[in-house]
């Protein structure tokens, strides 16, 4: 399991967007990854990878997905670990 080492707001530097509703009020962020249709989710206590579903209550109607981005979700996780933003629990 991966957990954040920094405040969740720092994930905005990597393109994460604050979740909507109660999730956003609790400082949760997400990033949709077109390659592989995954959604990266970070809260103050955990980091998770989910399948990207359009009806997910955490995601805005206009998602923050960069379709021209050639990275996979694993590439992004590797970059977050390398940037010292995530650690293993």
What is the predicted role of each segment?
Residues 19-77:
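Acidic, low-complexity, intrinsically disordered interaction modules
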Residues 2-20:
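Amphipathic alpha-helical segments
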Residues 10-12, 81, 89:
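Short polybasic/polar patches that bind polyanions
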Residues 76-85:
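Short A/G/S/P-biased low-complexity tracts
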Residues 1, 85-89:
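Short intrinsically disordered terminal tails
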